[in-house]
């Protein structure tokens, strides 16, 4: 029938006829790969029957002999997605565990290739600056690992040391520059404290409160490599890791020492800017204090030249040392040593003047003895005329008696009286008073 139709229409090309026949065969003979798994048996029976009837269809008869097509899957179903990220960004278990480690559910125990960020743990994109773990890889830090019993020898200690953290612990940001490492390590230490690992952080003396366990060391090693890529580490950190790439504790200890050094630098600058000196302390002690501060700042990279140092020192001088501001302010090339020579000269002059002054202070016992001897030996017996005396009336009576007797005596007695005017007149009374001439 079909050959008759083709002979009736010779203008139709042979290619079009072949295309129509091919399309008809596709519709009549369906490929068993497109059939669901529930109809596999029927497809096999149909293909067997077709093979017995038509020997010219080898494609359909060869399908059931292939063991790989025993349980075909629908071609239209997409592959399942494992986690919140696309399938092409995920890694297989063998790729995630190149060292042969067992696959842990706890994110802290996932082994990482040193200083390499896998797309599985840190997918590209601006959605977050922190690493995010897919649900199929790890659980929150508060959830114990389902395989922890097969991995850790002491699961109770591991739960208390590592998994007894907050449910959501914010990780530190990614290190992006060597200059940001001092600030980054502060956030990393805070992250360890929030993860109940504050006891393993070195203290001021460089020693931790307790001994770190192997599991905690693994957690330290893994998290440090994730959040601090090697290309952004300072040189001194790389030097430590080149000796021992797991010595994260030494890096933390050195970082804490540098933090203390930075605090000391700030204190030295404040002390140098607020210097005060008036000679109350020895000049040697003041010079030692200032030179130690300047040398310490210079060793730490903060250079203080002579001009700035002299200005800061002279700014704090007071008292007799204050005039050094005006005698030396024009000397542009003056050094700190020359300035302290002038300070020493003034201090020695002050000490010499204090030692040369006589000491007029007398002992208290000597003063008491002098006061006693004065009151006992220097009591006056000759008393000058005092109009407030109580016995003034008796003195007047005695004077009147003497005057009357002198008038009644002969003239020879007048000469004796005139001669004795320079001698004190003695009165014979019970008070034993002596009157000087001219006082009455």
From Swiss-Prot:
Signal peptide coordinates: none
GO CC annotations, alphabetized: cytoplasm
Annotated stretches, region: RNA-binding: 299-401
Induction: Ty1-OL is a weakly expressed element. Induced under amino acid starvation conditions by GCN4.
Phosphoserine PTM sites in chain numbering: 416
Amino acid composition bias (Polar residues), ranges on this chain: 1-23, 48-60, 127-152, 419-428
Annotated segments matching region Disordered: 1-93, 126-173, 352-440
Annotated disulfide bonds: none
One annotated GO molecular function: RNA binding
Highest taxon of source: Eukaryota
Key words, A-Z: Cytoplasm, Phosphoprotein, RNA-binding, Transposable element
Basic and acidic residues: bias regions: 429-440
Record-level GO BP terms: viral translational frameshifting
Biased composition (Low complexity): 153-165, 402-418
Subcellular location(s) per record: Cytoplasm
Site residues, Cleavage: 401-402
Domain topic, free-text comment: The C-terminal RNA-binding region of CA is sufficient for all its nucleocapsid-like chaperone activities.
Role: Capsid protein (CA) is the structural component of the virus-like particle (VLP), forming the shell that encapsulates the retrotransposons dimeric RNA genome. The particles are assembled from trimer-clustered units and there are holes in the capsid shells that allow for the diffusion of macromolecules. CA also has nucleocapsid-like chaperone activity, promoting primer tRNA(i)-Met annealing to the multipartite primer-binding site (PBS), dimerization of Ty1 RNA and initiation of reverse transcription.
Further remark: Retrotransposons are mobile genetic entities that are able to replicate via an RNA intermediate and a reverse transcription step. In contrast to retroviruses, retrotransposons are non-infectious, lack an envelope and remain intracellular. Ty1 retrotransposons belong to the copia elements (pseudoviridae).
Subunit and partners: Homotrimer.
Name of protein: Transposon Ty1-OL Gag polyprotein
The species this protein was found in: Saccharomyces cerevisiae (strain ATCC 204508 / S288c)
